[in-house]
From Swiss-Prot:
Residues passing through the membrane, by range: 1-21, 30-50, 81-101, 113-133, 135-155, 177-197, 211-233, 241-261, 274-294, 309-329, 330-350, 364-384, 408-428, 451-471, 475-497, 509-529, 610-630, 637-657
Provenance organism: Emericella nidulans
E.C. code: 7.1.1.2
Pfam families, per the entry: NADH5_C (PF06455), Proton_antipo_M (PF00361), Proton_antipo_N (PF00662)
InterPro entries according to UniProt: NADH_DH_su5_C, NADHpl_OxRdtase_5_subgr, ND/Mrp_TM, NU5C-like, Proton_antipo_N
Protein's UniProt name: NADH-ubiquinone oxidoreductase chain 5
Chief location of this protein within or outside the cell: mitochondrion
Biological processes annotated in GO: ATP synthesis coupled electron transport; electron transport coupled proton transport
UniProt-recorded Gene Ontology molecular function terms: NADH dehydrogenase (ubiquinone) activity
């Protein structure tokens, strides 16, 4: 069952990609969707067997590397963390496959698209099932390549080309540091197998663990789009909307958080790395919410809401890895629902993505409105919605730690939650509730999608409504044996007891009260005092504030001016001096020129004069006699004579070269 679970998406990708012309569009749809849905059913069975019964499974496939002391086996590992990621990845992926049948129905490259989707899913499975860092790195890299292919799916668009390259190159920064971290693990521990590294971690110097942890954290920062290496995130919206749902909900962005959770027994021994995770997650949460508030493109706004993965990084910094996993699962479902709902809106209004030109779509898209309302309520952690059970718990856990950093992070993340609520209300209000602002033709043709588009929305909404309440005791219940991903227990992991019983009620309710209050005030101002907002926007202060946040804190401008430009100049000089300089001089260009000069010089020795030929014969005779003589005497003198003759005969060659 477990091998079938792994291999089915790959088979679907191969058939759709290489035999697409034979099976046709319908055949590609059928094969890829059936393979992924079957894999999802098997993943649910694996979740019940491995997760609930707490029976880890390992499958030894083959020996991969056997080089001196490095011995790497290709082993697939199924434990609580792996099967939880399976549920997240495969349920969302199967629904995205079904949704894409209708959404991409008019695209001429359906087979290629579904092949990429299935390959993406397969490599994500490889990433989470690997038993060592090297197998994980294989999935990590190919997932990045698949994201490049999917974002650049419409390769005739220049914007898609630029965005895919930006995503690929930004992730290369994190991949480079992750590679350095893997080499540091290999150098320090002599192995890259999870079990070996985690078993030896308590006996190593904290500085070594800190260095490795920082490298892993930077790798996760790039993949999970934390602040600093987040610039690829909105640009990845150039791909089709189902791609955005798959990348930003369940696959690529969760890979970085998965790496931190998988490495929890290692980074737990470095307080520096945990504090860095804590602050990185908090800053990312506020940063993304402020930028998202000033975005006007529907998909880009939801892209910045994906940076709410900072909440999971906060949970990692609090050593509450099971809480991070719980929020990851919840986040995947409601974020996929938001993106697929956005795709339904874009599909209905002739591909227009500026939600300022929507308005009044509630009457035309009632199903889409309700599913996006449900997902938005979860995003802002309204009580008894799925996001409430994990997001608010993370905030309460931060306050429940009772030390300075976590308390400050609680208030910082609360501010981020406030602005997240504000832009969620902004999207719903301007898209569905306000007066129509778009052209009449959009409303004439606006309609809900067909069965393939609406069914995934309904399924996700049902899963989303019930999953948080049903699974909260499984993932973070005090008596559960499921969340055994910390590998060991210490008093710091019992933070949930303090969170549950010791945190004052005021601080439990504060994020919700502030979020709802700010949203209500903003809607009232927009509805009853619009001139006040317009006058403020056109004032110098309002203009500067709007420009600052709309330009994303000028971080991309800083990168382009001071980093990218310098790197390009350095690359140009390096290419000029090495690739176009010394390498060519010593390589094909220089060798060709030297041989040509040598042949020309030798050709000039032929003068057609008898006395010259007699001189050559005499020199050759003297050479052979001296060869016999000096072989029995001083070899150094012989070498000196040979060198002198060579210099005399080739003086012209050397000067010319």
């Amino acid at each position: 069952m477990y091998l079938t679970l792994i291999i089915l998406p790959l088979l679907g990708s191969i058939v759709s990609g290489f035999f697409g012309r034979k099976v046709g569009v319908t055949g590609a749809h059928l094969i890829t969707c059936v393979s992924v849905v079957t894999t999802t059913i098997l993943a649910i069975l694996a979740f019940l067997e491995v997760g609930f019964n707490n029976i880890p499974v390992t499958i030894n496939i083959a020996r991969w590397l056997d080089v001196e002391s490095l011995y790497v086996l290709w082993i697939f590992r199924f434990d609580s963390l792996t099967v939880s990621m399976f549920i997240t990845v495969l349920i969302v992926s199967s629904l995205v496959h079904i949704y894409s049948i209708s959404y991409m129905s008019h695209d001429p490259h359906n087979q290629r698209f579904f092949s990429y989707l299935s390959l993406f899913t397969f490599m994500m499975i490889i990433l989470v099932t690997g038993n060592n860092y090297l197998i994980m790195f294989v999935g990590w890299e190919v997932v990045g390549v698949c994201s490049y292919l999917l974002v650049n799916f419409w390769f005739t668009r220049i914007a898609a080309n630029q965005s895919s390259l930006s995503a690929l190159l930004t992730n290369r920064v994190g991949d480079t540091l992750l590679t350095v971290g893997m080499f540091a693990i290999l150098w320090s521990f002599g192995n890259i197998d999870y079990s070996t590294v985690f078993a030896l971690a308590p006996y190593y110097n904290e500085n070594i663990i800190t260095l490795i942890g920082i490298c892993l954290l930077i790798g996760a920062t790039a993949k999970s789009s934390q602040v600093g290496l987040h610039i690829w995130l909105p640009q990845a919206m150039e791909g089709p909307t189902p791609v955005s749902a798959l990348i930003h909900a369940a696959t690529m962005v969760t890979a970085g958080v998965y790496l931190l959770m998988r490495s929890s027994p290692l980074i737990e021994y470095s307080s520096t790395v945990l504090v860095l995770c804590l602050w990185l997650g908090a800053i990312t949460t506020v940063f993304s919410s402020l930028i998202g508030l000033f975005q006007q493109i529907l998909k880009k706004l939801f892209a910045y809401s994906t940076m709410q993965l900072g909440m999971m990084v906060i949970a990692v910094g609090l050593s509450s890895y099971n809480l991070a996993l719980f929020h990851l699962v919840n986040h995947a479902f409601y974020k996929a629902l938001l993106f697929l709902g956005a795709g339904s809106v874009i599909h209905a209004v002739a591909d227009n993505q500026d939600f300022r030109k929507y308005g009044g779509l509630r009457e035309f898209l009632p199903l889409t409105y309700y599913v996006m309302l449900i997902a938005s309520l979860s995003l802002v952690a309204v009580p008894f919605m799925t996001g409430f059970y994990s997001k608010d718990y993370i905030l309460e856990s931060a306050y429940g730690q009772y030390y300075l950093s976590s308390t400050i992070v609680y208030f910082v993340a609360t501010i981020g939650a406030m602005f997240t609520t504000l832009y969620s209300a902004k999207v719903l209000y301007l898209t569905f509730l306000t007066n129509p602002n778009g052209p009449l033709v959009n409303y004439k043709h606006a309609h809900e999608g067909d069965l393939f588009m609406t069914t995934p929305l309904i399924i996700l909404a049902i899963i989303y409504i019930h999953s948080g309440y049903i699974t909260k005791d499984i993932f973070i219940g005090l008596g559960t044996g499921f969340s055994l991903i910390n590998s060991y227990y210490s008093p710091s992991h019992e933070i949930m007891l303090d969170t549950e019983f010791a945190v004052p009620t005021l601080f439990k309710l504060l994020p919700f009260i502030l979020s709802i209050s700010l949203s209500v005030i903003s809607v009232l101002l927009s509805e009853f005092l619009p001139k006040l907002l317009i006058n403020f926007k056109f004032s110098r202060l309002g203009y500067n504030i709007f420009s600052f946040f709309n330009q994303r804190f000028y971080i991309e401008l800083f990168y382009n001016k001071y980093i990218v430009e310098g790197v390009l100049k350095l690359g140009g000089q390096t290419s000029k001096s090495l690739d176009k300089g010394s390498v060519e001089l010593l390589g094909p260009y220089g060798l060709e020129k030297a041989l040509l000069s040598l042949s020309n010089s030798i050709g000039k020795l032929s003068t057609s004069v008898v006395t010259t030929y007699a001189l050559y014969i005499l020199i050759g005779l003297i050479f052979y006699i001296s060869l016999l003589y000096f072989s029995y005497n001083d070899n150094n003198l012989f070498i000196l004579v040979i060198f002198t003759l060579f210099v005399l005969l080739n003086n012209n060659i050397i000067n010319k070269f």
